[in-house]
Amino acid sequence: MTQSLADMRREYTRDGLSEANAPSDPFSLFRQWFDDAVKTERLPVEPNAMTLATVDADGHPHCRILLLKGLDERGFTFFTNYESAKGRQLAANPRAAMTFFWPALERQVRIEGEIEKVTAQESDAYYQVRPLGSRLGAWASPQSRVIADRAELERLLAETERRFADQAPSCPEHWGGYRLLPQRIEFWQGRPSRLHDRLDYRHQDGVWARERLAP
């Protein structure tokens, strides 16, 4: 490495986060921040990219980057192979955490909650608007399973292309969406001298309560 890790740092000076300017509903604040990220983050950065953390049946944590594909008053939706490693982990322990980081805005959002599968109709609706290659890939790839080499994956894709040569692929039963039902949402805004702003929303008795956390 050309630079010491201990010397890598930057000052956060772009903005602040005060209770006076933060709505009581965390979904409203998330939408505001997400819209800001869409306008500000430079391509090819994907503002809907997030880290999804899960825990397997043995208590081991796992995380990976996914794309947020839905947001409404119920929660945050993403799609994957139900038979993948993350799918098996969510079946064993249906709780997860998400983290969004928008460095250009010096902002981070952490979300924790329970997981539910979306309906088959919701999964199919999203599947049908995906590019054809992605739809075929959902059939072809045995996600998270060991394969011999890249050639095996390409062979599986070729077989899938032949299978659906004369018909549009339907949504596989092993593929679909999950929704994270948030119980906690924390908004982090970088500030100078590492004295960051942190507003923590917790869902209690059907309402959202908000507190400020020390950085």
Curated annotation (Swiss-Prot):
Enzyme Commission identifier(s): 1.4.3.5
- Write out the catalysed reaction: pyridoxamine 5'-phosphate + O2 + H2O = pyridoxal 5'-phosphate + H2O2 + NH4(+); pyridoxine 5'-phosphate + O2 = pyridoxal 5'-phosphate + H2O2
* Family under the similarity heading: Belongs to the pyridoxamine 5'-phosphate oxidase family.
Binding positions (FMN): R64, I65, L66, L67, L68, K69, F79, T80, K86, Q108, Q143, S144, W188, R198
Q: In which pathway does it act?
A: Cofactor metabolism; pyridoxal 5'-phosphate salvage; pyridoxal 5'-phosphate from pyridoxamine 5'-phosphate: step 1/1; Cofactor metabolism; pyridoxal 5'-phosphate salvage; pyridoxal 5'-phosphate from pyridoxine 5'-phosphate: step 1/1
- Give the EC class as a word: oxidoreductase
Q: Where does substrate bind?
A: R9, R10, E11, Y12, K69, Y126, R130, S134, R194, L195, H196
Q: Which organism is it from?
A: Pseudomonas paraeruginosa (strain DSM 24068 / PA7)
Q: Which cofactor does it need?
A: FMN
Query: What does the function comment of this entry state?
Result: Catalyzes the oxidation of either pyridoxine 5'-phosphate (PNP) or pyridoxamine 5'-phosphate (PMP) into pyridoxal 5'-phosphate (PLP).
Q: Which keywords, in A-to-Z order, does the entry hold?
A: Flavoprotein, FMN, Oxidoreductase, Pyridoxine biosynthesis
The record's note on quaternary structure and interaction partners says: Homodimer.
Gene3D superfamilies, alphabetized: Electron Transport, Fmn-binding Protein, Chain A (2.30.110.10)
What GO molecular function annotations does the UniProt record carry, in alphabetical order?
FMN binding; pyridoxamine phosphate oxidase activity
- Highest classification ranks of the organism: Bacteria, Pseudomonadati, Pseudomonadota, Gammaproteobacteria, Pseudomonadales
Q: What is this protein called?
A: Pyridoxine/pyridoxamine 5'-phosphate oxidase
